Structure formats: C-alpha cells, structure tokens
Swiss-Prot record:
All copies of domain Laminin N-terminal, residue ranges: 47-286
Signal peptide residues on this chain, from the entry's feature table: 1-19
Organism: Caenorhabditis elegans
GO cellular component labels: basement membrane
Protein name, entry field: Laminin-like protein lam-2
C-alpha cells in the first residue's frame, strides 16, 4: 500500500513540474502535541509517542564540494544547446572572478527563483570534461539523515551516465545508492532496472529512465530511496531499509555527457556546447533521531565545531538519540515506531541509588533489566528494596530505620514490616517497653492483669496504676475495679462515656433501674420525596423552605442578613428524655464559604422558652462549606459537650421532657443558602428495629413516693390532683374538692366530674339550660330553663325568667316576636323569615321591609322591585351581582341616540351591557362616536360618510366635525381627491412638488399630470432649469451662443434633417415596398463598369513590356476584397438575426408593460382598501364580535361567493395569458418578416400583405385581451362592493332581546361552561391575531413589490424605445458601409501604382473601418443590455395576476375571520346549540385556511413555471448575443484583411506620375463616397448613448434586485402561514365541564 501511495505522489509531482517524491518516512500528526506543546508526548495522556523532525531540504544552503567548476582557472567560453541542428548556438563566457558570469558550487543549494535562476556549471568538453573524466559533487550533511529523495535539476542536458553514492555514517565508506545510464551494462556492468528481491533490498539499481538527451534544459532527476523496495510497506520492521535510507553524506559522480554525436568532429563550437550545469541539488529528508526527537539543533562539540545534533527526548542521548541516558537502563535501547515510542526507562532503585547497569539475564527473567548498585539508607537488593537485619521501612519512606526493641519486654530484636516488636504477655508499646492498660508490675516475665471492668473504666480502657493496680473509673462509676454506679445513677454501660445514666423520675424519686421492653431507634428525616414539614425561621418569624430534589435536602435562604434556622417538625418535639446522652446527627452544606458561627447555631427549646444551645463547630464539628458534611452532637449536660447554659443533669433532662422546638442554623452569611439532609435524633421506643433490634438499657423504671404512680412517677394517684392546675409531671399531687357534687376529679386539670346538673372545676355553678345556686351542696340546687331549644336563661330581679339566647330572627323575653329585617308571626305558628332585598338595602336602617309581607321598602344603589332585584330606568347593570352598586347610568349621547318616546330627559339602554340605541353610522356604548369613516354626529340624524379618496388620503377617516380627510403630502380637498397648488402627479404616494425653477419659469404652477412647468422663452426642462440648445446663462435670459456654435448648430440641424430624411425614406420603403427595377441605376452601373474597363485596358497597355507585378498584386487585392465582401454579407445576416432577438425582447417588454400597468392599478386599489378600509372594517367587526353573540349566515354566504368570484377571475386570467402568448408569437413572427422585408428584394410586396393580415390578427388579440382584463376589473370591483356590503351588515348586527329574569335562572346552569368557553375563545382569538398580523404584513409587502414593478416598467419602456432607435441607426450605418465597400472594389480593380494621393485614401479607409468597428461594438453593447433586461424581468403577467388573486383571497379570509370572531368571543350566554354552531364555523375556517395554503402552493408553482419561461427567453437572447459576437469577430477579421491590403499597397513598386494623374479623377470620386457615409461623426453620438444606456441598466439592475428581495419575502411569509389549527378542542366537552 505504501508503494502505491508513493508512486501516485511521484506521478502527480512529475506532471506538475515538481518531481520531488512524496515523503515515505512514517510520521505522526503534526498537530498532535502534548499539553506542553512537545510533539514527543501525547496531548491527552502525556504518554510518550514517536516523534520526528520536520521534513526539510537537507541540502539547502550547504556547501557542496565539487571537483570541477567553469571559469576558476581562466575565463572559459560555453555555448548553449538549441536543440535544432540548423540553428546556431548562443555562446557566453564563464568567469569565476565576476559574479554575473560565475557559476560556483554554492548555486547548487541556494534559493532558486523562477525568473532568476542560478546554477553550477563545469568546464566544457573543449577543456576535456568527458568520459572517462569524472566530476564529483559531494554534499556533507553534518549528521545522519533519513533520506526520502535526491533531486537534481539540470540546465544542461542530463548526463548519459552518473552515480549517486552515500555514506551511512561519517566514518563509513562510500557505497553506491543509484546508477543512471543509457548503457547500464556497458558502463556499470549492471542490468537495466534489475529486480530488487526480498533479502537483498540494500542494492543499488541502474536505470536508463533519465539518460536521454531530451530535454535540452530544465530536465529533472528524482531518486526515491524506497522506490521498488519490497519491504517499503513495512519500513518500521525492516532494519535493512532503515539503514538503506540513512545517509550522512551524498556524492553525485557525473561520468558521461549526453551528446548528439557531433563531438567526434572536434569542432570547438560543438565541444563548447557540452558541459554539466545543475541549478538545484535538493535532498528531501528528516534529521535522523530514531523517533526520539522532534528537532535538530546546532551544538558545539569537543573540538569547538558547531554540529547538528538531535534535541533528544524519551530519556535518550547521542547525536542521533541512539543510546539511553545513564540510569535509564531498565530495558535495551530501541528506535521509536508509530506503535511504540520505545522510550528509555529509568532503573527502579527505590530512590535509594543513582547508579545502575543493564542486566540482560535479569531482563530476560523479569522484563526489567536495571540492576541497582551502591544502595543507600540501610537497604540492599537488585532494586534496593530490602532492609538490612534489625531494620524496617516506614510506610511511604524509602530509607530503613533500626527496630530498637526493648530487650526486657521483647521476645526478639527483629521487628515486623510495621516496625512493631514482638512483646511478652501484658507488655505493649512499639518497643515493648511498658505494661498494657489494665496491667501492672513490668518485669522480664511481662505484666500482671488489674481486673478492671471495661464498661466502668475511663474511655472503656481497663487502665490501672502500674504500681498499685487501682483502676481509673468513669465519672458516674465507683469501686476499685469500676464495677458499679454511683447513688442516683443506673445502667453501667460501655457505650456511656460517663458509665451510668442519672435517675430523673421528674424529681419525685432518686432510685431507679433499667426498664425492660425498650429498643434503640432514631427519629429521622431523609427528604427523599418532600421537605417533610421542616420550616424556616429568622429574626422576623417563620420563613418558607424549599425542597432540593437533586440534593434530597430541604433548603433555606438568607435575604435580610439575619441567620435562618431549620425548624424541626412535630416528630422531633415533645418528650425526648430518651434522647439524653444520644446523638443529634445531620448533613449540612451552604452556598458560600464565608461563615460566621455563633453560640446559638443549634438550639433546643423546652417548656417556658427554656433553651439549650451550642455552636456549629462544637464537639469537633467542621465549619459549614459548599460541600455536604455530616455533623454529630451528643445531647448531654457535661460542659465538655458545650451546651449553654451549663445546668445540672436533672434540669437538662427536664428541658428534654417537653421540647417545643429544635432549631438548626442553615445560613452563615448574607444571601447564603443552606441545605439540610439526613437528620437523625437518637432515642428509644417499644418497637424494635427490623435491621438492628438493639436493647435500650438507658430507659429508667422509678420507685415512686405516695401520691405518685407511673414508670417515671409522672402521674397522680387516684383521688389526687396537681397542686397547680395543669402543673405538669414536675408538680406535686394533692387531694380533690367538688362541693359534694362528685367523688372524683381529673388529675392534671383538677376538674371534678360533676353531677346534679352542675358544672365548673369544683361543681360550683349550674349547668347550661339550668338556673339556681349550686354552692348549697344539695341535689335540687339547679332547675330547667323555659326557653326554646333548651336555651340558657337568667333569673331576673323581679322573679321572672328571661331567655338570653333567642334564635336568629326572634326576640322577646320568651323569643316570641320577629326581629327587624324578618317577617312572619310566631304567635300564629308562622316562622320568622329574613327579608330578600337582594343586598340592596342599608343594614343599619330600620324598617327595610314589611314585617308581614316581606316587601322591600328602602332600595338603594339605583335599584327597584319587590326584592330590589332590578336597576332603575335609565340605568343598566346587574342588581344582584357582588359587590353592590353595579347599576350605572346609561349616559346616552342625545344627538346620537334614537328616542323611542317623547321623553327627552330619559334615554334608556340595554340593561345587560348598557348599549344605547344608536342612530345610523353611530357607534359606542353611549352612541357618542361616529363609525370609522363617518362624521357630523351632532346632526341628530346619524353620521355622514367621509368618502375619502383611497389614493389621496392616509386612511378612510376624517375630522369628526368638518369631514376633512387626512391627506397625503401634496394632496388637498375635503376628500383628498386632487393635488394642491404647485404639486402634480396624483397617486397613492400623494403629489410631488412642482419645484419650478424661479428664474426660468413663468410661475410656480406646473401641469398636474406631467409636472411640466411653464417655461420662459429659450428655457426648457421639466423644472425650466436649463437653457435651450445653443444657449447659455439662464439667469441672463438664456443668451445665444457665439457664431461658431451657430455654425455647429446649423451643421447639427443639417445632419438631423438628413437622418430624418433617411428615416422617412426607410419608412417609405417599409410601408410602400416595390420591386427593384431602376433602369437609371442599371445604366449607371454599366457606365461605371465601362469606365473601369477602359482604365484597366490603359493600365495593361502601360505595363505590356513586362510589368506583371502590378497585375498580380491587383488580382490578389481583388480576391481579398471579394472575400471581405462575402464576410460583410455574413455580417448582414448576423445583424438581421440580432435584430430579430431585439424585436422579440421589445415585444415582450410592451406586453409586460400593458399587463403590469393594468394589474398595478387594480391591485393598488385593492391594497389601499386593505390598508385603510379593510383593516378598519375588520377592527369594527372585531369590536362588534366582542359585544354580540349571534352568528351571521349571510357573511358565510358572501365569503363563499367571493371565493367563487376569485376562481372565476383566475380562469379568465388563464385565458388572458393564452391570448397574450399568442399575441407575442404573432408579434415575433411579424417582426421577423418585417426584417426580411428590409433586405428581401422582389418579394417585399407579397410579404407586406401577409404582415398586414397578421397585424390585424395581433390587433384583434390585443382587443380581446383588453376586453377580458376590463371584465376582470369589473368583477374585482363587484367583489370589493360585496365585501363592503358584508362589513355594513356586520355593523348592523344588534344584540337580541334578553329577559333578565330568565337569564338569571340560566346563568347558574351554564356558568362553569361559559368560563371554560371564554378561556378557549380568548386563546383562539390570540392565535387568530397572529394570522391577522401576517395578513397585514403580506398586504404591505405586495404593495411594495407592485410599486417596484411599476418603477421598473417605466425604465424598461424607455430602454426599449432607445433600443429601437439604435437598431434603425445600425441598419442604416451597415447599409452605407456596404455601399462604400462596393465602390472601393470597383476603384481598386484599375489601380496600378500609387503615390502621395493613395496615402490619403488609405487613411480615409482606416477611419471608415474604425467607424464600422464602433458600430459593431455598439451592437454588442445593445445585445448585452437586452440580455440583462430580459434576465432582470422574472415577473410576467400571470405572476402579477396571481399576486392579485392572493390579495383577494387574503381579503376574503380577513372578512371571514371577523365573522368567526363574532361567533366565538361572547358565546357564554348561548346554550349548547350555539356552542355546536361555533365549532362548525371553526371547522369551516380551518378548511378555508387549508384551501388558502393550497392556493399559495399553486401560485408558487405558477411563479416557478413563469421563471422557466423567462429563462428560455434569456437563452434565446443569449443566442442572439452570440451571433452578434460572431459578427463582431468577422468585422475585426475583415479589418485585418484591409490592413493587409494597405500594407501590400505600401510595398508596391513606384509607377509613373503621369499614370497616377489619369486615375486622380476616380480617387476623388472614391473620397466623396467615403465622405457621404459620415460614420465617424456618428461615433460620439453612439458613445454618449452607450453611457446613458449603462446608467439605465445599472438602475434597472438595482430595481430588479429590490423586487426579487420582496418576492422572496412574500414567499417566506406564505411558507410560514400555518397549515392547520393546532389548538383544536371539543367545545361540547368543554361546555360540560
């Protein structure tokens, strides 16, 4: 594979003239560097990898030692081979003393520039430089290189035989590398291209490939070191080839020159042409570093010489990185490969030695060959890995240290791998030098056991005095062996830091023991699903917490620079005595590293606001950080644990017995966030843990005093109560007291369980519903009350019983009367019922209703009715709605409201929405506004229509009082229907200022249509801002120019008359063709022919004595002129073809002009209507739809009818397009035949008749097209009128009459349905608003595009007019040139000799042909302009019609949308039938939107088809242009032929002057013919015309570019229109919710 790639690279370079072979040496990715930029290490892994220096030209600027150089002994002459035997060689001198003539050896390796090439050159064969004399070129590289190729570029022919040698190393012998010879066998004894076989690849090959003498100069020879070597594809595995490509010096031995064989004649000139000359000696390769360096650098050696060496990596050294550094001998040195870097590895001496050697045997056994010597630190071994005797190595250290074992307490002086000595029984210590804890009496026999109890010993470590054996006990433990609790404590345990737990018993006993049936447990919060009722609190109060799902934590944040605490939920509160001496554990992290700790970071709050607190860092806990950390706090009274205040154990447990809050500080800096998770509080319970059923031995069982009972003496004995009511378990118990009405009481509250209809804590009063004195202590103390519903009563001083709590609506001593605001008669058995006044009465007022009938008497809030349920006349609203006061004044505007009666002061309105009954064209809730486009509301008859002109006004609105429309700039009139004074050009953009020049105008008023100002005499221009032709000084009254300009003016007038006459003549020929039968013309031709014959005979007579030269040259001139005339005829044909193309373009432009202009007017009106009337009407319809709920079937029918009209118009547009295409085809054919008529000859009359007939057909087609367009316009007007009627119907829609009482009954049933439907409607409205905005934007874009089309069309019209004029002038000019050339031919047939006169004729002829060339150039320019114009007009009639159709469809859809809005917005007052109708309308709307999208797709396809038609037209125009280009080439060729004729004439021999005089008359006639052509005078006119054309074309291109952008914008808008409604809901289901 490698060989194939090399051959391919070599072939490519050879064909490109760069025959260097491609690099074959394996390399790494040049961008593959390590993190430090070192390519010898992988960027990502930092692992070593093979690296090589850059591929360079190793010979560049190196000195080449040569054995022969020309010009060194003396200047020598040499001749350059030409390659042609008949051509003389160019000889030069080589002189080494002068730089410009020397060719030294340094030129072999210098920088060569293509246009300034340097070379080395040997002496020539003249100086004896030929076989067997050999010339050697020796290049010393300075160090070894891996060579890819050696390249030589010869200035002389390449040698016939030469050899390339190399030295592998500096001290090695020269060995042949490659032989080149055309005679391999004879010269070197080798076969040509002998095959190289595996196993013998380091063999030089001989080839004759580059030994040919051709090329004479510039020959290349490229030797690739690996070409043809079988193992080249496995280069890295072949040590033979690696050595083969290595070279430290290269020698080129030039043995024999290539010659043509002519040296045998010993001609010095020939011998000097044979020599060796080489311009470039290049050696491609890399500095050899064996894959261990990426660059070579200069280095000073021992002898001070600067040499090239590798900058070695991979722990290697040497000039070629060919050996390992000292101490890097763990494996043998190898060169790096693409697979393995083979870096040298350091010996593993455990950092205890810096000397090692490579041990081959060790390498074979272990794979590591580094053998360490001189180990330090009490070590030994191959890797210094062993300690010497009685020493050991500490973990993480290399050195070994002495064991130091105590001889009394140790069994041996050698320690183990951890440095521990082997101790005797009871002995401990690293060196076995002390007794174990719990042991004493250190001796040679070891130590004795003290017998300490582990659970009672300090820190659970049995420890005693080493002399006496006394044990060290925990705080609450006593005894010599620490085996019992102190009095008042229980539960001796190893898990208790203090040994025993204090007896609490609520202070009622000090004797207790361990209770059975309790197990250890945790109260936990893990926050795996929510925040588990944890709250937050700061100095202000409670704060909300957040659940952090990812962290499984609860979070709080600091917002006011005050600490925020996590507050534990209820499960952590209450009686937590079992948590004493247990741990509170949680995980905490914060958002900021800054922490400000406090002594109140952890707070436990007990009863009566008692607190226990500590710092977050107490008990060795860390500062909170952004990393989650676990915190553990022991709940214990000992000062060691840091709880404040410092109180005794019983008081501490007393706080735990009724915990009201546990607070954990969460934030420690401003705007900090704290995260709490995994909260656990150690406690005990009766339910064992399934995972770890551990006995809870710290739960007490107390021995109680009399009056107390319970496990903890927490309750009073039966018959006893708390000394203080609800005094709690700490309170003492005393006997009960119940005034003889009970024998028992509740222990905590002290309340008696009363009997005898008594109540109270001590039965001191009568129960509810009873009266009497309970303190008497008898059973009859309390009697029953005579009140309704067993209500309470009191005994009055007069002895009567009075009921104190009558039912609502009742009053009186026995509750037997109705209260104010109620009606009924309790005494007759009629209940008291609250008066129903709908909340429209004053609750503080008395007598709001009749107490018997319930009729409301004092209605407020502008209401009336039996129940105050309706608004008063002249008011509207809902009298029942909350809050009250909804009845508002109608406030109808009198001038705009209909009066149903003669009461002018009271104008009623609809009580549901407040809408007044408006006069025609009046709108507003209070009928106080004119509708959009109307005015004069004060008339009392309604509003009058503004009737603003759609073109001249900014919209359809006008002043509501005067009716004045808002006019566009420059427009005036109440209706904005005419241009203001001093303005013109009434259009959709307003009117433009006349801007008449004050000096040149009679006044400032201009023509209202064209804008032409009334100019003073001799002044012209639209603005009257310039003088007439040949006049100057407008400020001075346009004075006439001087006489010289008068003469020029006269000549210009003459020329114009001639051109006009010529145009008239041409037009006469076209209109009145006749057969060419001019007898006088024929006679004149015959007379001229006879004269020419006579002259010719005279010439022959003069030259009869042997002057055949003139005759021959004259005949040649004649033949050349005939050929020129034939080519001119071809030019005529090309011009005719170009004219056909130009006429076709002209017809297309005219057709587009007519169609676009008609469509522009129609669409401009439609667009203006959409922008003004359409948008305003749509807004009015939308407002109406907000008020009314009924749908208009008439609107749907009108919209459907409008769509049918649009389809009809589309069909008619298609017919118009077909007729237009037929008209174009007829016009094109007519134009072609007219062109043929100009050059047609005798058939003109017949063809003119046919043209007239086709012209009539064309006129008929045009009339039909116009008729259809007019019909289409009428249809569009009808559609617009129909849309206007539709909008009027929308305005006329009125709300139906609704019965308020019936509506009130229905509201409750459909209220929920209405709310859902309103939400859906609002969403639908929002979605449709976006569509409405899209419609408006589309309309605006269409308007802009049509305006651009209009401007472009105007420019195109003018351009086509100028094109037609240019074409006529070109035809005239070509005809004149043809006639002139024919006259020249007749004159040249008799020419014999020429003198001074002929020189003048020649100059005139040159000028004539220059004019012809200018005409041709103008023709080419016109064709280019035509081509550009046709390319710039991609929009044709159908395209514009399609856009109009799109605008019509969008208008219809806008009206339909307005209808749909009415059907949707306030449908909450409709029933389910209305809802279904709305759903149906929405589906219809979706179908219409889908149809709209399909229409847009159809229009897009039509536009693409039109674009293809335009492209075809451009292609035809391009063919016409190519024909014109060929005609231009023909004219240029003819010009060259004429110049040749003139040159031939110049070289003719002189003749007698007398003979020239005889021809002078003929020459004068020729001059007159040339002058009549006057082509030179037409050139400036054509040049100016061309400049004008260029300006117009540039403007046209700019307009077309803008138009195309607008088209793309419209297409993008169309593509973005939604194809369907995505918010489809089932309104019936929504209504049932």
């Amino acid at each position: 594979m490698t060989s194939i790639l090399w051959l391919f690279s070599l072939a490519v370079l050879w064909h490109m003239g760069q025959p260097q072979p491609a690099e074959l040496y394996p390399s790494v990715d040049p961008n593959h560097f390590g993190a430090d930029g070192n390519p010898c290490y992988d960027r990502a892994t930092r692992q070593p990898q093979r690296c090589v220096p850059d591929f360079v030209n190793a010979a560049f600027n190196l000195e080449v030692q040569v054995t022969n150089t020309c010009g060194t002994k003396r200047p020598t002459k040499f001749c350059v081979q030409s390659g042609h035997t008949g051509q003389r060689s160019v000889c030069e001198t080589c002189d080494d003393r002068h730089e410009g003539f020397s060719h030294p050896a340094k030129y072999l390796t210098d920088f060569n520039v293509g246009n300034n090439e340097t070379w080395w050159q040997s002496d020539t064969m003249q100086e004896g430089q030929q076989y067997p004399t050999t010339t050697n070129l020796t290049l010393v590289l300075g160090k070894s290189f891996d060579i890819t190729y050696v390249r030589l570029k010869f200035i002389s022919p390449r040698p016939e035989s030469f050899t390339i040698y190399k030295k592998t190393h500096t001290d090695s012998e020269w060995e042949p590398w490659q032989f080149y010879s055309g005679s391999c066998r004879a010269t070197y004894g080798l076969s040509d291209r002998a095959p190289i076989l595996p196993g013998n690849e380091a063999t030089a090959q001989c080839t004759k490939e580059f030994s040919d003498i051709s090329p004479i100069t510039g020959g290349n020879i490229a030797f690739s070191t690996l070409e043809g070597r079988p193992s080249a594809h496995a280069f890295e595995e072949s040590e033979v080839l690696q050595k083969w490509v290595t070279a430290s010096a290269i020698r080129i031995s030039l043995n024999r020159m290539n010659t043509f064989g002519d040296e045998v004649f010993k001609d010095p000139q020939v011998l000097r042409s044979y020599y060796y000359a080489i311009s470039d000696f290049a050696v491609g390769g890399r500095c050899k570093c064996n894959g261990h360096a990426s660059e070579c650098v200069g280095s000073s050696s021992v002898d001070g010489e600067n040499r090239l060496v590798c900058r070695c990596e991979h722990n290697t050294q040497g000039a070629d990185c060919n050996e390992c550094l000292p101490f890097y001998n763990d494996r043998p040195w190898r060169s790096g490969t693409s697979v393995e870097a083979n870096e040298c590895i350091a010996c593993n001496c455990s950092q205890l030695s810096n000397r090692c050697y490579f041990d081959q045997q060790l390498f074979e056994e272990t794979g590591h060959g580094g053998h360490c010597i001189d180990c330090q630190g009490n070590t030994q071994g191959v890797h210094c890995e062993q300690c010497i005797a009685n020493h050991w190595r500490r973990p993480g250290e290399n050195y070994c240290v002495a064991c130091g074992c105590n001889e009394i307490g140790s069994l041996s002086t050698q320690c183990d791998n951890e440095g521990k000595c082997q101790c005797k029984p009871g002995v401990t210590g690293r060196f076995c030098d002390q007794c174990l804890d719990g042991f004493y009496d250190f001796s040679t026999n070891g130590c004795k056991n003290c017998g300490c109890e582990t659970s009672g010993s300090l820190n659970n470590q049995p420890r005693c005095d080493s002399s006496s054996g006394s044990c060290s006990c925990k705080l609450n433990v006593e005894g010599r062996q620490c085996d019992k609790c102190k009095p008042g404590y229980f539960d001796l345990s190893t898990e208790n830091q203090f040994g025993c737990t204090p007896c609490f018993c609520f202070g009622h006993s000090s004797i207790c023991n361990t209770a059975d049936g309790y197990f250890a447990m945790n109260v936990s919060s893990v926050f795996d699903q929510d925040k588990q009722k944890w709250a937050g609190q700061n100095r202000i109060g409670l704060q909300d917490t957040q659940w952090a799902e990812l962290d499984k934590a609860v979070a709080v944040s600091d917002t006011d620079n005050s600490p925020v605490y996590f507050v534990a939920p209820e499960q952590f509160l209450g009686d937590q005595r079992s948590s004493y001496n247990q741990d509170l554990v949680f995980t905490l992290k914060v958002a900021k590293h800054v922490t400000n700790q406090d002594v109140k970071d952890i707070i436990i709050v007990g009863a009566d606001r008692q607190e226990l607190s500590t710092s977050i860092t107490a008990q060795g806990n860390p500062f909170p950080t952004t990393e989650a950390q676990t915190y553990r706090f022991r709940v214990h009274a000992d000062p060691y644990f840091g709880w404040y205040p410092r109180i005794n154990e019983l008081d501490f447990i007393g706080i735990l017995s009724n915990i009201t809050a546990i607070k954990i500080r969460g934030t420690y800096s401003y705007k900090d966030i704290g995260y709490l998770s995994n909260v656990n509080l150690g406690t005990a319970g009766v339910a064992p843990s399934a995972a770890n059923p551990k006995q809870a031995t710290w739960i007490e069982h107390c021995e109680c005093l009399p009056g107390f009972v319970g496990q903890f003496c927490e309750s009073c004995e039966s018959g006893f109560r708390r000394e203080t009511k609800f005094g709690g378990p700490f309170n003492h118990c005393i006997k009960c007291d119940c005034h003889n009405h009970s024998n028992s009481c509740e222990a905590e509250s002290g309340s008696c369980i009363c009997e005898h209809n008594t109540a109270g804590d001590t039965c001191e009063r009568c129960a509810r519903g009873y009266y009497g004195d309970a303190l008497q202590g008898t059973e009859e103390d309390c009697q029953k009350c005579p009140c309704p519903n067993d209500g309470p009563c009191i005994l009055h001083a007069d002895g009567d019983v009075i009921c104190t709590e009558c039912p609502n609506g009742y009053t009186g001593r026995r509750c037997d009367e109705c209260s104010d605001g109620y009606f009924g008669n309790p005494k007759d058995g009629t209940e008291c019922v609250e008066c129903a006044c709908s909340g429209n009465t004053d609750p503080n007022s008395i007598g709001n209703c009749d107490k018997i009938t319930g009729e409301c008497k004092k209605c407020i809030f502008n209401t009336h009715g039996f129940n105050c349920e309706n608004c008063k006349p002249g008011y509207w609203g809902d009298a029942l709605i909350e809050p009250k006061g909804n009845c508002q004044s109608c406030g109808c505007f009198a001038a705009g409201t209909r009066r149903p009666n003669n009461d002018y002061t009271l104008l009623e309105c609809n009580q549901q929405d407040g809408q007044c009954d408006c006069l025609p064209n009046v709108i507003g809730i209070q009928c106080d506004q004119c509708a959009h486009g109307f005015y004069n509301i004060t008339s009392g008859l309604g509003c009058q229509e503004c009737n603003c002109d759609p073109l001249g006004s900014e919209g359809n609105t006008c002043d509501v009082n005067t009716g004045q429309c808002q006019c566009k700039p420059g427009v005036t009139g109440q209706r904005c229907d005419r241009c203001a004074d001093y303005h013109f050009g009434f259009s959709a953009n307003g009117c433009q200022p006349c801007d008449c020049e004050y000096i040149g105008s009679e006044n400032q008023q201009c023509d209202v249509n064209s804008g032409q100002c009334l100019c003073k005499e001799n002044v012209e221009g639209r603005r009257c801002d310039q003088c007439a032709e040949n006049r100057y000084g407008i400020t001075q009254g346009c004075l006439p120019c001087d006489d010289c300009y008068t003469l020029i003016q006269s000549r210009v007038n003459v020329f114009r008359e001639k051109v006009k006459s010529l145009d008239n003549t041409l037009q006469e020929i076209i209109e009145n063709p006749a057969p060419v039968n001019d007898t006088k013309f024929d006679e004149k031709v015959k007379e001229t022919s006879r004269a020419a014959s006579e002259v010719w005979e005279a010439v022959k007579q003069k030259t009869k004595e042997g002057g055949g030269t003139i005759k021959t040259k004259s005949k040649a001139i004649k033949d050349e002129i005939v050929a020129a005339l034939e080519k001119l005829t071809s030019i005529d044909e090309s011009v005719a073809q170009a004219k056909v193309g130009a006429d076709a373009a002209e017809n297309d432009m005219k057709r587009w002009e007519i169609i676009i202009e008609n469509a522009r007017r129609e669409i401009e009106n439609v667009l203006h209507y959409l922008e003004t009337e359409g948008e305003e009407r749509a807004q009015i319809a939308y407002n109406a739809s907000q008020k009314y709920g009924e749908q208009s079937k008439r609107m749907s029918e009108l919209a459907s009818g409008t769509r049918e009209e649009a389809e009809k118009h589309l069909k008619q547009a298609s017919e118009i397009e077909q007729l237009s295409e037929q008209a174009i085809a007829n016009a094109t054919q007519a134009n072609k035949e007219a062109s043929d008529a100009i050059y047609g000859g005798e058939q003109i009359s017949k063809q003119i008749a046919e043209l007239k007939e086709k012209q009539n057909q064309l006129n008929e087609s045009i009339h039909r097209t116009l008729d259809l367009a007019e019909e289409q316009k009428k249809s569009a007007d009808e559609a617009n009128n129909l849309a206007a009627v539709s909008l009027t119907n929308v305005e006329a829609v009125k709300i139906p009459s609704v019965d308020p009482k019936e509506l009130r009954n229905d509201v409750a049933g459909v209220l929920e349905e209405s709310e859902n439907l309103v939400d859906s409607s609002v969403k639908e409205n929002s979605a449709n608003d976006e569509l409405f905005d899209e419609v408006n934007r589309s309309v605006a874009d269409a308007r802009n595009e049509l305006q651009s089309s209009q401007d472009q069309q105007r420019v195109s019209d003018q351009l086509m007019l100028e094109l037609e004029k240019s074409r006529e002038r070109i035809v005239d000019s070509v005809s004149t040139a043809d006639k002139t050339l024919k006259d020249a031919e007749a004159a040249l047939q008799v020419l014999e000799e020429f003198g001074a006169k002929i020189e003048k004729s020649r100059n005139d002829a040159v000028a004539e042909f220059a004019g012809v060339e200018g005409i041709n150039q103008r023709l080419d320019d016109i064709i280019d302009a035509q081509d550009k114009r046709r390319n710039s007009l991609p929009i044709d009639k159908q395209f514009v019609i399609d856009y109009r159709k799109s605008a019509d469809v969008l208008l219809n859809e806008t009206h339909a949308l307005a209808d749909r809005y009415k059907d949707i917005i306030h449908s909450d007052v409709d029933t389910r039938d209305s809802t279904e109708a709305v759903q149906y309308d929405i589906e219809q709307l979706m179908e219409e939107l889908t149809d709209s999208n399909e229409n847009l797709q159809y229009y897009k396809k039509q536009a693409e088809d039109d674009k293809q038609m335009a492209t075809e037209a451009v292609r035809k125009a391009t063919l016409a242009k190519n024909s014109a280009i060929e005609a231009n080439a023909t004219i240029l060729a003819e010009e060259d032929e004429i110049k040749k004729i003139i040159n031939s004439l110049d070289t003719m021999e002189e003749v007698n002057n007398a003979e020239l005089d005889e021809l002078e008359e003929e020459i004068d006639r020729l001059d007159q013919l040339l002058a009549q052509a006057q082509l030179a005078k037409e050139v400036p006119t054509y040049q100016q015309y061309r400049a004008d054309e260029d300006v117009k074309v540039a403007q046209l291109k700019n307009d077309i570019s803008e138009l195309q952008k607008e088209v793309l914008n419209l297409e993008e808008i169309r593509d973005n229109l939604p194809t369907k409604c995505f918010n489809v809901i089932n309104l019936e289901q929504e209504g049932q919710k």
